[in-house]
Regions:
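A short, well-structured beta->alpha microelement
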Residues: 2-3, 32-45, 49-52, 57, ...
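Structural motif
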Residues: 16-23, 53-56, 62, 89-94, ...
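Radical SAM enzyme [4Fe-4S]-AdoMet core and its adjacent flexible, acidic
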Residues: 56, 82-83, 92-201, 246, ...
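Local cysteine-cluster metal-coordination motifs and their immediate loop/turn environment
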Residues: 185-188, 224-235, 281-291
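Recognition helices and adjacent regulatory flanks at domain boundaries
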Residues: 237-273, 282-284, 305
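Core AdoMet radical
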Residues: 271-281, 290-322, 335-351, 363-382, ...
Length: 562
């Protein structure tokens, strides 16, 4: 990669030549401060900041000399308002990664210095620390719609989008389907009642089926609907719910609400947000999952259920009436789609996933936002690398379903090879470093005490930033919830989380990870479900017996729950 290409790729706004650094400490410091201030003024209205340090005279034998230079750069950057920027060093110094970590550990700057190393002439650059990039100054905790200004809409629309506890835009833009065909207004909906079934009905028929019409009317009249209970539970604990996220990212479609008929029907059937679980094809059998969403669960479920269960169920489940049914129904919506959520099963193993990407590429719909929930154990299919696809799209967010590290992670998500997961992440950093990646753990009683250690481990390895974690609180199955813990264990968890938050909060400008741990404390203390502990141990031992495992050999801290 040439210097010119780097300027273009990373929107470089200036360079500083370190050959100007001299033995005169004060003179050099004053010079460097002026250079930083000049760059700052030049990019005052920009959303990111990169400072390139030229390699002249920067390759030094003494770690101390290089450290002094870098430390002074950090001090100077702290004197300049860089709250909306990040600083990035490109250097030929082979010790850059080690020294950058030392300097960052001494700094309280929430926007730390980051580094790229190159062996020379800015060729073959490898990422040693993922650059902090807030190019849109995205505010995770804000519920305001991203694509419209609330001051520009009517007072009624403003109320629906920002104040109503019941309104959600999803029923006007979206349908969700399981691999078994059950359809819902979204993936957060409670599982009963179903809103239709794609094995007997088309998506368009479900669109104005009575449950959907009733839900829309409930939302507009401010009535609670049991379908939305999980989002309300999340909001009560302080989590940013799926409902709030829907209004934030899709609230610009509020005009569709005005066209709702008296019976709740909506004539306009154009799905701008997709979340169709094409099948249950998966290579893992996670503890919190089951046969509906994982084909690997089939044999275990047959042993657990016994009787005629195996005769009455199939390994692979598909959402439509045949393998092409869902695809054929979605094609007309390709002109309208703005965002696609890929989950599973395991989406990176599904041909339907790559079929959609191929069609988007063919139509040059690189503006479609791609969001993933993936176990991140496979990143290609039949020679097709998903990394090469992701590089082409304007916005890709990859949430890796990783609950714990090492043996714990392999136990909770059975079939995982932890070394492969870490290698996949390193390859992703090399091939498509600009793609948003975050850990998306399911917080359960099994990983609750270990999650902070896992989080810090990946940050220290340079695989994620501290902010790159999105806690998904497990609500079902209920016997895995963190609120089954007794008071003493909850107190221990809260203490561990409070300590972790002290480390995290100053490094989390997005505030997403911080909210996750804070809300988890609220969530577990809100309810006493200790009566489910017996169920937890019984279900765990049953599965351990089938899989020839023993949970306390892997997660010994759970002995405290006995």
């Amino acid at each position: 990669m040439t210097l010119a290409e780097l300027h273009n790729k990373y929107q470089v706004v200036g360079t500083i030549d370190l050959s100007m650094w001299s033995d005169d400490y004060q003179t050099s410091t004053d010079w460097l401060l002026r250079e930083c201030q000049n760059l700052h003024q030049a990019v005052y209205t920009e959303n990111q900041r990169i400072i390139f340090l030229h390699n002249k005279d920067y390759y030094v034998e003494s770690d101390t000399s290089a450290g002094i230079v870098l430390k002074n750069i950090q001090v100077i950057l702290n004197e300049v308002d860089i709250s909306n920027y990040f600083a990035l060093v490109v250097s030929t110094n082979p010790n850059i990664a080690k020294e950058i970590e030392t300097i960052k550990s001494l700094s309280h700057d929430p926007v730390p210095l980051n580094a790229l190393h190159t062996p020379g002439e800015f060729q073959s650059i490898s990422l040693t620390q993922h650059p902090y990039n807030r190019k849109e100054q995205y505010q995770y905790g804000s519920a305001n719609p991203l694509k419209i200004n609330l001051n520009d809409v009517s007072s009624q629309d403003r109320f629906l989008l920002s104040e109503s506890r019941n309104f959600c835009i999803y029923p006007w833009i979206h349908l969700h389907a399981w691999p078994t065909g059950e359809a819902y207004p979204c993936c957060h909906a409670t599982h009963s009642p179903t809103y239709g079934n794609t094995k007997q009905q088309t998506l368009e028929q479900i669109w104005n089926h009575k449950p959907m019409r009733d839900l829309r009317l409930d939302m507009l009249s401010g009535r609670d609907n049991e379908t939305c209970r999980k989002c309300h539970e999340q909001e009560d604990s302080g989590f940013f719910s799926g409902r709030q996220s829907a209004n934030k990212h899709h609230g610009h479609h509020i005009d569709r609400v005005h066209k709702t008929q008296e019976d709740g029907s909506v004539v306009q059937f154009e799905m701008t947000y997709w979340d169709i679980r094409f099948s249950n094809l998966c290579n893992l059998k996670c503890r919190s999952c089951g046969h509906i969403f994982s084909s690997q669960w089939y044999q275990d479920q047959a042993k657990l259920a016994g009787g005629d269960w195996k005769k009455n169920n199939t390994v692979l489940k598909i959402a439509g009436r045949d393998e092409d049914d869902m695809w054929n129904q979605l094609v007309p919506h390709l002109d309208y789609v703005e965002q696609i959520y890929f989950a599973g099963g395991e989406p990176l193993l599904m041909e339907e996933h790559y079929r959609i990407l191929d069609e988007l590429v063919r139509r040059k719909r690189f503006d479609v936002r791609l969001i993933y929930n993936t176990n991140f154990t496979h990143t290609d299919l039949k020679g097709q690398s998903v990394f090469e696809y992701w590089k082409q799209f304007d916005s890709v967010a990859v949430g890796a379903s990783l609950d714990a590290s090492g043996a714990r992670g392999e136990y909770i998500r059975k079939g995982t090879d932890w070394a492969v997961v870490e290698q996949n992440r390193r390859e992703m950093i090399e091939i498509c470093p600009g793609v948003d990646f975050y850990i998306s753990p399911t917080l359960s009683i099994m990983n609750a005490l270990h999650l902070p250690d896992f989080h810090r481990d990946w940050v220290e390895k340079g695989l994620i930033r501290a902010q790159d974690l999105n806690v998904n609180i497990l609500q079902d199955p209920v016997h895995y919830r963190i609120d089954i813990a007794p008071a003493e264990y909850k107190a221990q968890l809260e203490s561990v989380y409070r300590t972790h938050l002290e480390w995290l909060s100053v490094q989390d400008p997005l505030h997403r990870a911080t909210v996750g741990f804070e809300s988890a404390i609220t969530y577990m203390n809100a309810t006493d479900n200790t009566h489910l502990l017996d169920t937890f141990w019984r279900k765990t031992h049953e599965l351990d017996s089938i899989r020839n495992e023993h949970i306390l050999d892997i997660i010994p801290e759970l002995k405290a729950l006995k």
